[in-house]
Amino acid sequence: MSSRNIKGKEIALAKQKGINPFEIKVALDGLAVVVNPANSVSKLTLDQLADIFTGKITNWKDMGGKDEKIVILSREVNSGTHVYFKEHVLRKGDANGKEEFAPGALLLSSSQAIADEVAGNSAAIGYYGMGYICNKQKAIAVAKDNKSEYVNPNIDNVLSGKYPISRPLF
């Protein structure tokens, strides 16, 4: 299973070997953005998320939370989850976008590592597939923009297309 589309160079390599690859969507996944339950912030727009994860916003007080430096957590760069979040949240779907994660972002090896860090750090924010959500983290509601409805990451909202950080799995 993969959380990203087949890359052009992968298709070309397969064809060189006589294989004609194709994708089959087998599931949908929502990427939950999570904070520690002690964090009072419960909703953010995609623009606010982009500003946090790129380092433009560095303190929770700017988002209505405590005066505390934001600790950014991300999956490692070779993770499909990392790539999807960068392309669809930081770069807002712009294929020519240059936005990157903040230099101080902590790159962790697994979604479970992000879940554990968020559970123990009141200033942390991270993201992972909805299946990792538990009561030791708080999933925040996300809106496409400040004029849109804030939507919680849950199965119904992913299936209906309401949740803005959803992706197919292949």
Each PLM stretch: what is its role?
Residues 1-170:
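Exported/periplasmic ABC-transporter solute-binding proteins
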